[in-house]
Structure formats: C-alpha cells, structure tokens
Amino acid sequence: MAPKGKVYRGSVKDFPGFNASQDADALCNAMKGFGSDKDAILDLITSRSNKQRLEICQAYKSQYGKDLIADLKYELTGKFERLIVSLMRPPAYSDAKEIKDAIAGIGTDEKCLIEILASRTNQEIHDLVAAYKDAYERDLEADVVGDTSGHFKKMLVVLLQGAREEDDVVSEDLVEQDAKDLLEAGELKWGTDEAQFIYILGRRSKQHLRMVFDEYLKISGKPIERSIRAELSGDFEKLKLAVVKCVRSTAEYFAERLYKAMKGLGTRDNTLIHIMVSRSEIDMLDIREVFRTKYDKSLHNMIKEDTSGEYKKALLKLCEGDDDAAAEFFPEAAQVAYRMWELSAVAKVELRGTVQPASNFNDDGDAQVLRKAMKGLGTDEGAIIEVLTQRSNAQRQQILKAYKAHYGRDLLADLKSELSGSLANLILGLMLTPAQYDAKQLRKAVEGDGTDESTLVEIMATRNNQEIAAINEAYQQAYHKSLEDDLSSDTSVHFKRLLVSLALGNRDEGPENLTQAHEDAKVVAETLKLADVPSNDSSDSLETRFLSILCTRSYPHLRRVFQEFVKMTNHDVEHAIRKRMSGDVRDAFVAIVRSVKNKPAFFADKLYKSMKGAGTDERTLTRIMISRSEIDLLNIRGEFIDLFDKSLYQMIEKDSGDYCKALLALCGGDD
C-alpha cells in the first residue's frame, strides 16, 4: 500500500466487504466441472488486493485441503495463467520467481534483472533476497554472481545490498563533488572509472542523485544519460541508464518499459505481465499518467489494441481506467514534462554527422573510379556507393567538376542512366547541394495530386535561417518561381500562413528572454484555452500570435516558453496542441514543438515510422538519411536506440540490396 503520509497511487485497492471464505468458495465453483469460468476467476482476483489474495489462498487450503495456485495452474493456460498466478504470489516472491527464471538454464535474461534490481526500494530488495532464499533454498547474490560478469555483475551486487541512503538524506556539500567525480570518472578520463560510477549511483539517495544530475548537467552541458551512452556499452550501460531513469522517475521508467513491451510486431508478455502485476498496488496511476503524456495514447488503449481474450480483460482490470476517455493531464505527467523541457533548455548538444570529408581526397581519382564503374556492360554499383557515401557534400561537388573536366560528360546524367529505383534516388540526392536537395523535395511535395504536408513541415520547421535562405535561392533557380508562391497556392489558409512564415527565415537566433517567455507562454495558454483568465483577443488573433511565436522565436527562447507553459497550466504544450487543435496546422505545430524539444529525437521518430510495419516509406527514409548525414545523424542514431531498443543500423539492415548497402554506409555504424 501507499507509504506513510503519501496518497495511494495504485490501481488495485482492498475490496470492501471482503470475505476470504466466500471468495475461496467462488473460485472453487468457477473451477468445478468441465472447463472453468475464466471471467469469474479474473473478475474476483483482479479486484482483490495482494494481501486479500493471500488470505483467499489460506482459506482455500483450510476449506478444501488443496493448493489454490496449483488448481489455477491446472485450470488455466498460457499468458492468462501466468498473469493470474503472478497475482496470487506476494510481491517479493513474484520478483524472486522472475529472477529465478531469468538466470535459469542457458543464457540470462539481463533485462529482467535490470528492471527489478534498478527499480526496487531498499525494503523491497531485502524482502526479495529473503523470498528467494525461502523459495529456492539458494543465495540470490551467489546466483547472480555466478551468472553475470564484469562491471555489470559488480553493479548488481551493490544494488542487491539494498543499502541506498533514504530519500531524506541529501548531502548538499557532496552534490557538487559527486557531479565532478562522475564527470572525471567518465567524460574527462580515457576510459571510465566504473567503480566511482557504481558507488555513487548505487548508494546515494534518489533525492541526492537528482541534485547531482542537475549539477552534472550544469558543469558538463549534457545530461548524464548521454555521457553514459557515449562511455559505456552492453548490459552495464543498460543497467546504469535504468538506475538513472528510476532515480529521475520510476513511473516514467515503467511507462517506457510498458510501451516498448507492446510496440511493433509481437508483445513481450512476460515484461507486460510482471510490470502490470508488480506496480498495480504501488504507482500504476502515475505510470498511466506518464504513459499518456509521452506516447499520446492511454495505457488502457494500447493494452486493448495489443492483447486479446481473458488475458486482455485481466490486464485492463489492473490498469483500471482509460486516460484517453478522461482526456486529463495529471501532476505526475506535468512534472515529467517540465523536467523534459528543463533538460532541453540547459543541455549543450554537440551535433555530429556520420559522413566526414575524406582524408587524402582526390577529386580526379574519384571521377576516374566512377567512370570505370559505369563503362561497358553492367554497372559496378558497389564502387559507386563506396565513393559517394564516403565523401562530404563539398567533395562530391568537386567530383562533379572533375568528371566534367576529365571526360566532358555530366556525372549526374551518367548516374541517372546507369542506376534505377531507390538506389538512383539516393545517389542522385547525394550529388545535389543540401539546398538543391531540399528545394527538390519541397517541389515534389507541392506538385501533382495532393500535397505532402508532412514533408513540407519536416523541412521548413527544422532548417535554420541560413539554410532557409539557401533553399529559397535554389528553388527560384531550379523552378523559376518563388518557393513562397508555390506554398501559398497549394495549401489551406492557416497552414499556408504557417509555411510562408517559416519560409521567410526570420527566426531570432539569440538566447531566451525570461520576461518575454512568460508573456509568450500566456499567449500559448490563451490560444489553447488553458489560461485562467479569458483573453479579449479573438481566436484568430490568438492563433496568429501563437504562430508568430512558433515561427520567429529562437529555439532556446521557445524551450523556456514551453517550460513556463507547464508551470502556468500544469499541461505539456504538445499534449495540449494535440487535444485542442486539428488538421495540418495541428500536425505542423506539433512538429515544430518536437523539433524544438529535441531535433535528433524528432528525426529518429520519423525514421522509425518510415520503416516499421509492412513496407518502407523509402522517400522519407532517403530524405532524412541524406539531409542529416553531415549534420546530426550520429545524434539521431543515439536517440533511435534509446527510443526503440534497436539500432538504426539494425532497422535498416532488415532490407537487402544496393540501396540498403548505401543507407548503411551513410548510417556509419551499428550502436
């Protein structure tokens, strides 16, 4: 139940008028005869607290001389059986069973070890160790040590001690020192001093560590998660990231784990079951709130879409409510949103591409290699890919000139005649300057039947003033008309106003103005009808002012605006836009907000969506891989693996052929 002095945040509560003997009778009747009444079983068990379920087990034994868990195992099957049986165990014994399964047999389920040991309180760890000893007559630490290795093992052993300082222990004089020690142990040292990391992350109180992470961000300019990813790899990296996430917000950590358990093809049912069971009487309401905020979908609806039968019914009972139906935003979610904007506002991100200028570059030599690859019968696509994906755009422009000078031929025309399909689109795109390529993509988005609004927004919302100016010039030169005219003639009124404003390239590029940020946040709140005091402005006037703020304020300033917005309304701006706006304008506003928050994450999400499910959106995939290859594709790779538990390289690799080879070359490596 809830810790003393805190509001209960579980979804499962004690059943009023509880009678263990009557419940034991009801379960016995549900399992009598041919078949069993699964609905009766799930309705009863999911509506009782764990303490009440244990009393039912005792009453069942007393009345029928039989083991209730054994009978349930006999009557039920599959995922539903695993879920119901998990509910019948005390939490510590349920954790012990999960860990025993994780280390039994060949191989170890490291993710299960990480999830449990990174997220439990001191008391929960002590109870787990005792339950493991009682259930299996074995020492948990000895089994973990025997089944793991290296620094991963050392960190698990530290966590198994359950010796973290309690949350009211904050050594303010040590905060700055711990932050410096973490920085010196990682970023500033050749190799990482894991012992220092392990001690601080494994022993300091959560409240103390939150202050350490804030201090670390100030002195290093980057969140500690980014440093961990850069310095470490494998299970040790995953464990440390899990500890950091649980320190920041256990609810957010579990929301992310639940989302990853259900997204994409297939469901990780063991993960889904264990989290839904283990958090149902602790913080399920907080998890639901964070889930709704982060993924713009309620946990209830995701379970509903991803599962079936009695298994689904039981999970939904544990979830308890549908936050999409409530359409509310909650304090826990607001805290998470505020922290995300705070991180975005103060982090100093070093943008890094995957394609660098080739050393010992020889434009004439490359021109000769390309000519040889296209002469005679057949084409050597491999040679073309190897040269052009390993040169910077500036070097490719030199190759174009050298090819013309050496052979009197147009390299673009030759490539176009020799290549076809997706590979041709990719290689020809690489040969254009960034501005020419963006101009061409914008032209394709506005010509023909229908307008590709998503592409228009992606390009216009993510380019800086200098890039926008170059695109305008390239567009005029290539198509003999202004980009603004084409955008105006092919889009709706409000959407047109937004695109034209972005096309002017008049975004301020200075730092934030805190006074102005507060005033801008008021305008945003009034526009989205979340202000305490109604505005005298018309809705059209407010929308125009909101549009102006989004299109002309600097990114650092907008981050502060959206942070102020959370403080002012207890809502996240992206969530509010999705709820209160519609159509192309809503999608464009959301794209701008997500780009402001974290541009690499914005592109990582678009890349994932271009490849998930059946078929690949090659146009989007090609466009982003080309346009970001020399800017921030390395950052995008980092965000991709963090968001989707799979590297960008692995996601691309599922395809085959020369197009895939070229994409992998641009990707630049597997994370």
UniProtKB/Swiss-Prot annotation:
Keyword Magnesium attached: no
GO cellular component: calcium channel complex; cytoplasm; melanosome; mitochondrion; nucleus; plasma membrane; vesicle; vesicle membrane
GO-annotated molecular function: calcium channel activity; calcium ion binding; calcium-dependent phospholipid binding; phosphatidylserine binding
Gene3D superfamilies assigned to the protein according to its UniProt record, in alphabetical order: Annexin
Subcellular location per the Swiss-Prot or TrEMBL entry: Cytoplasm; Melanosome
A single BP term in Gene Ontology: negative regulation of sequestering of calcium ion
Keyword field contains Transcription: no
A Pfam cross-reference name: Annexin
Intervals holding Annexin repeats: 18-89, 90-161, 173-245, 249-320, 361-432, 433-504, 519-594, 598-669
SMART domains: ANX (SM00335)
Keywords: Annexin, Calcium, Calcium/phospholipid-binding, Cytoplasm, Repeat
Family indicated by similarity: Belongs to the annexin family.
Domain comment as written in the entry: A pair of annexin repeats may form one binding site for calcium and phospholipid.
Functional note: May associate with CD21. May regulate the release of Ca(2+) from intracellular stores.
Name recorded for this polypeptide: Annexin A6
Species: Gallus gallus
Lineage summary: Eukaryota, Metazoa, Chordata, Craniata, Vertebrata
Gene name per UniProt: ANXA6
